[in-house]
Structures are given as structure tokens and as C-alpha cells.
Amino acid sequence: MDSNRINGAGSPGCQTGSVCRQEDHNLFGQAVNEARSLSAVPVPAKAPIWSSSAPYGNFSRNGYIWNNDVWGAGAGPQTISVREVNQWGVWSNQPNTAGIKSYPHEAFNIGKPLSSISALRSSFNQDVPTNGAWDVAYDIWDSSNQHEIMLWTNYTGNPDGSGNVKPISYHYRQDPSGAAIPVYTNVNVGGATWNVFEGYNGHKVISLLRTSKTNSGTVDIKSILQWIKSKGYFGDINVGSVQYGVEITSSPGGMNFNFNNWSVTSK
């Protein structure tokens, strides 16, 4: 047996030629136990600088705006919390019924013509549940609110437009899938590959669904807007609000969506 181990434990024992006292062992053991107790204490999450359970609770700081945005029929309770300018989250308990209930989001206003923008990029990082029905997406508007461009980064449906969440479309398959029908497939632009859907919701809606879902990345929004323009959907629009959040159709029992890092860079 190792002479420096006590009863097989990892604490030091008596050294050769030294006087060994039981109280020394007791004091050492007490110190180890206290250290272990301290290390087991969880580090508390950073307290939010703002939170709201109001349907349209909103908050702004450093040019960024947050909105709880609970707008759908039959919506349940939801609380949005902001921890830092680029870090926020939402707890949402939405029933398992059809229709989008909410779009909690963070936003940044650009307010410039597309032709005068030399760069427009955004980075994201999020943690999302594995069940429910939802899509994490950019929602980009022109200043006149006549054009809405959605970029789905992660979602519970399928890239082909089928599943429990579907993009707005002029055409849906007349089969059990009821899938939205894309107008373009496998378009490589803005740093990813997308399927593109076109529809109308009181205004023109162009939805791009990533063919490979992800919880982190960087999107070249300028390149995507230029590609859409090249297809004749709009001219030199004035880019308005760039939003990022989650469209929640259902999150029964309450689910957490955490946005760990989100930013927009515009030049």
C-alpha cells in the first residue's frame, strides 16, 4: 500500500519520520469536503436586464430592439428575457394547435437603400428544443413593409416545405404531406444552400429554408437580397428592419429558446 494514502483515499498521510495526529487528518478531510462543496455550487445565470410577459412587451438598447410579439389566436403564456445586447431568451408555452402563436425576436434597423449598402451580415448562435413546432428565422422587411424576406436557419419541418411547420406559399401539394412547393431549390447564396418559396400574406413573402439546419453561423444578407432582386422580385428597395427570432406554433408544457449570440454588421 502507498504509505501516503489513508484507507485508499487520495488525501496525503503521514510522512516517514513525522508524528501523525488524527486531528490532522480530520482537519484535512474537513478542508477537502468544504472545497468539494464549494465546487459543487452552480454558477448562477446572469440576471436579465429586462424581461416581459406582456404580449407586445418591448425593450431597446444600443440600437437593438426586442419584442415578445405574441400575436396568434389562442396563444398561451410567454416570457422574453434580455441578458445582454446580443444575448436573450424566451420561455413559451403554446398549445398544440394549428397556426403561429408568436414571434419573439431581436431587431436592428438598417434604413438604407440596398444599392448604398456595401455589406450586410449577421451572425447567430442559439439553443433550441428538439420537439414542438417552430422555426428560427430572420425576418427582413423593406421600409414600406411591402416585401418580407424570411431566412429559416433551424426548424421542425422539412427543407422541401413539408412537416409540422411550412413556409407561406402560393402553391401546396395536393397530397397528405400538404407541402409548400418551392420556386427554386438548392440555391447556394449568402453562405448556405436554400430552398426558396414565394407567397402572399397581405404583402409579398419570400422564404428561404436552409437545406441543412444549423444553430450557429453567419449569413451574408446583402448577397441574398441581391440574388432576390436579380430574380425580379423587387428593385432597389430601402432595407428596413432585420429581425431574428422564433416563430412558435406549439411548445406544449413550456419550452426554452436561448439566443446566445446575435449581431448585425452593416456598412
Regions found by a protein language model. Give the residues of each.
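Extracellular "spike/adhesin" assembly and maturation modules
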Residues: 1-33
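Solvent-exposed N-terminal domain segments of exported/luminal and surface proteins
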Residues: 35-87
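Extracellular-facing segments of soluble proteins and assemblies that are Gly/Ser/Thr-biased and enriched
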Residues: 96-182
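Conserved, mostly hydrophobic/aromatic
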Residues: 191
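Signature of long, low-cysteine stretches enriched in small and polar/charged residues
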Residues: 194-196
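Long, compositionally biased interface segments
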Residues: 211-267
